[in-house]
C-alpha cells in the first residue's frame, strides 16, 4: 500500500482510468435512457389501444347505447377514451387519454390510431367522483379537420352534443347537426358528462413512440404513411361494428 502511495505517477494514471470508466458509463446511460423511455411510451400506447377496444365493445353491448349504434355507420371518425377521470366537490375537472381512428370515405377502411388527451375544467355545485368510458363520434368533415390540429376546443373549434349516457341515465337530446356526438358509460355520482369547452390535444410523444418516428395526426389519419400491426384488433372491431357484423 505504501509503495502505491509513493508512486504518484501510477496513482494519477489509475485515477484517470477510473475517470474514463465513469465517463463512458455516464455517456452510455444517457444514450440508453431515451430508448428506454420510448419503449415505455410505446408500451403505454399499446395498453391504451387494447383498453380502447374493450371500451368500444362495452358501449356496443350496452342496451342504453341505441343512438351510439345507430349513428356509428355515419361517423367520419371515432375517438375512444377508455378512462376519463372526473372528481369534484365544488370545482370539477376531468381528463384522460384516447385514440382516434378516421374512416376513408371511398374505401370505408379505418385508419391507424392517433393518440390524444382529453381534458376539461368546470365550476359548479358538483359532488362525487367517477371514471367514465367515453366515445366521441365525429360526424362531419369539419370535426375531423379540427382534430387534425395539435389542439382543439370542443364547442368552439367543433360543435359537440351529448348522446345517451349509460347506466340508465339519459343525456340531452342529441343535436344531429353537431360535428361531434359524445357517448359515455359511467358508474359515478354525476348524472352525465358534458364536454363543452373540453380541450383535445395530440399526444406527440405516444404517436412518435408507437410508430417509431416523428409523425403528425395528419400522417396517421389522412396520409396513412405509418402503420403498427398491433392495432389490427382495434381497427377490425370498429370496422365490423360499422358494417353491422
Regions found by a protein language model. Give the residues of each.
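Bacterial N-terminal signal peptides
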Residues: 16-30
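N-terminal secretory signal peptides that target proteins for export/translocation
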Residues: 1-14
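Sec/Tat signal peptide C-region and signal peptidase I cleavage site
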Residues: 32-37
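Small-residue-enriched, tightly packed secondary-structure blocks
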Residues: 38-245
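Residue-level detector of alpha-helical hydrophobic segments embedded in or interacting with membranes
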Residues: 3, 28-29, 77
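N-terminal secretory/membrane targeting signals
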Residues: 11, 15-18, 193
Amino acid at each position: 500500500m505504501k509503495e502505491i502511495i509513493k508512486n504518484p505517477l501510477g496513482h494519477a494514471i489509475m485515477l484517470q482510468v477510473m475517470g474514463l470508466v465513469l465517463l463512458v458509463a455516464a455517456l452510455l446511460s444517457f444514450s440508453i435512457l431515451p430508448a428506454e423511455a420510448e419503449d415505455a411510451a410505446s408500451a403505454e400506447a399499446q395498453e391504451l389501444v387494447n383498453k380502447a377496444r374493450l371500451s368500444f365493445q362495452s358501449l356496443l353491448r350496452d342496451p342504453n347505447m341505441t343512438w351510439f349504434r345507430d349513428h356509428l355507420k355515419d361517423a367520419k371518425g371515432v375517438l375512444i377514451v377508455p378512462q376519463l377521470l372526473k372528481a369534484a366537490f365544488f370545482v370539477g375537472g376531468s381528463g384522460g387519454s384516447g385514440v382516434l381512428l378516421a374512416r376513408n370515405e371511398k374505401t370505408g377502411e379505418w385508419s391507424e390510431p392517433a393518440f390524444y388527451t382529453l381534458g376539461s375544467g368546470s365550476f359548479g355545485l358538483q359532488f362525487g367522483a367517477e371514471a367514465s368510458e367515453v366515445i366521441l363520434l365525429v360526424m362531419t368533415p369539419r370535426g375531423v379537420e379540427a382534430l387534425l390540429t395539435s389542439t382543439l376546443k370542443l364547442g368552439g373549434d367543433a360543435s359537440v352534443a351529448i348522446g345517451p349516457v349509460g347506466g340508465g341515465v339519459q343525456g340531452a337530446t342529441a343535436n344531429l347537426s353537431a360535428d361531434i356526438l359524445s357517448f359515455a358509460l359511467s358508474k359515478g355520482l354525476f348524472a352525465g358528462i358534458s364536454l363543452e369547452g373540453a380541450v383535445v390535444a395530440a399526444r406527440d410523444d405516444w404517436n412518435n413512440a408507437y410508430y417509431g418516428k416523428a409523425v403528425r395526426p395528419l400522417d396517421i389519419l389522412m396520409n396513412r404513411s405509418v402503420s403498427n400491426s398491433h392495432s389490427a384488433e382495434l381497427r377490425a372491431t370498429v370496422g365490423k361494428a360499422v358494417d353491422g357484423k
